[in-house]
Swiss-Prot record:
HAMAP family hit by this protein: Thr_tRNA_synth
Family of the protein in this entry: Belongs to the class-II aminoacyl-tRNA synthetase family.
EC number: 6.1.1.3
Record field: catalytic activity: tRNA(Thr) + L-threonine + ATP = L-threonyl-tRNA(Thr) + AMP + diphosphate + H(+)
Official protein name in the record: Threonine--tRNA ligase
PANTHER family: THREONINE--TRNA LIGASE, CHLOROPLASTIC_MITOCHONDRIAL 2, THREONINE-TRNA LIGASE
Coiled-coil regions listed: none
Entry note: cofactor: Binds 1 zinc ion per subunit.
Origin species: Legionella pneumophila (strain Corby)
Amino acid sequence: MPNVKLPDGNVKHFEAPLTIYDVAHHISPGLAKAAIAGRVDGVLVDTSYLIKEDCSLIIVTEKHEDSLEIIRHSTAHLLAQAVKALFPSAQVTIGPVIEDGFYYDFAFERSFTPDDLSLIEAKMHELAKANLSITRRELPRNEAIQYFKSLGEEYKAKIIADIPENEALSLYRQGDFEDLCRGPHVPSTGFLKAFKLTKVAGAYWRGDSNNEMLQRIYGTAWADKKSLEEYLFRLEEAEKRDHRKLGKALDLFHFQDIAPGMVFWHPKGWTIYQELEHYMRNRLVDFGYQEIRTPQLVDRSLWEKSGHWANFRDEMFVTETENRHYAVKPMSCPCHVQIYNHGLKSYRDLPLRLSEFGNCHRCEPSGALHGLMRVRNMVQDDAHIFCTEDQIQSEVAMMLELVQSVYKDFGFTEIKYRLALRPEKRVGSDDVWDKAETALKLAMQGRNIEWVDAPGEGAFYGPKIECSLSDCLGRIWQCGTIQVDFSMPARLEASYVAEDGSKQTPVMLHRAILGSFERFMGILIEHYAGKLPLWLSPVQAVVLTISEKQNEYAEKVRKTLQKRGIRANFDLRNEKIGFKIREHTLQKIPYLLVVGDKEVENCQVAVRTRDGIDLGVMTIDTICDTLTQEIIRKGSI
């Protein structure tokens, strides 16, 4: 006779086994109607799950954090059912949940078209409205293989053949459609009220380019229509803000097939890049870093010693000359240890903070490349701090101060922190891990930082803090990393003479703030929709003449601005002023300085912003002072 403990601490006693739906109905008919699934002793199950023994139970409704994954997984099955109804010869393969949605891969003799997607989505709504019951059954492995083969579903049979023989196989049926799945699923298709198919793309079977190409249909699903509409709005906004489109429209950069995943920076884009580098260089000097430069092409022997050759070889560009094998560096860490090792180090030399704008190359798969967000050639704001175990906390605290300050200057104030803790397989003693993890926690506490623990997700060589930004659309971008490393210094024979004269191995702290310049620029462009803050804008002001009579004065204004350190340009073309204003507004130039006869006479400029705000007339000195102060304030405006 099961006793069921509910989240509020109450225990319900039942005289016989019963389903989760029955428990929900016992509490209230409304809860039973809203129940999507249940969590029994921490495990998600269907509402049809039979409770036979004492347990704790959370009844999952659409308001519960678990509901979205279940809704999306069930909607993927609804998609597959609709495709099979409309295109019976299509074979189903896999349909997992992904961030903000789901996809399903199909084997079909032709590509699905946008018109097909509209038909499929309409069929999905029809099936959802039918409120078909979703039921679960189990089959022995071999019987399941034969069952799907009899349906002509060869891919599904192959998937089952790869599942261990002792693993229970469950199938879910809705109407005349049945699919292999672990579950859980919603009780009926009527729970699926808010979904949208978003796109179709090609995908190789099992992700292997040697296999056949499948058709992947993507979709999104939410608990209610309001959430779906909000997501679709964000998706539309993200499309408008796509850094690849803005990069072309604003003449910042481009990509070419002659150098896949490598950026061709145009003058305006390179200006932004240089501003980032200049800013970071100055901040690092303030925090006691010494900038270094290491080779890009390094002998294979170093990568073997560091462990990168064994674990990272497929992502490295390699070459051979004079019977020696070299690799273009995918990261700077081993080279930084070489600089540390050059000369005897004492405990008095620690902490030693080395930084580099490391030019790195990684052989990312061509299908994974995505504008500035995923490239093969990137520059990282790499830094490595060599310190003692006792210095970890103070060094990490200093890094966190720098991280928070830098992100604030770029206009990001909502930062999420994640602490990746020791994995099962690791180097170093438990005492050392205890000390390192405690140091990271105390450093964050000292900065009043809230974080989420991620047990088991640390690297084998040390715990780490991950710093993620939230942009204007609520998207999360992991950029900063503070990684403790107990392994590499020992592998590469780094040492120092301790106070007692003994030879000791330093701890190495890997630190990145922006991550890569390329990706961070992509994030900035999308966050600001191309309207970068004044201090980052490639052209900060443009002087616009009404007629050629003001050309000489416009040149004088531009030169004055430039002498004050403001990136200024002028437009002397014989075009109407309205045309000029519109054109430079579309180019997202922060300030438009219009000069006509009256402005020339009074040594003034008429000031407009790119948002169309008229700031009136100002003297040249006043506009210079105004822009200079805004540049100094950076993200604190």
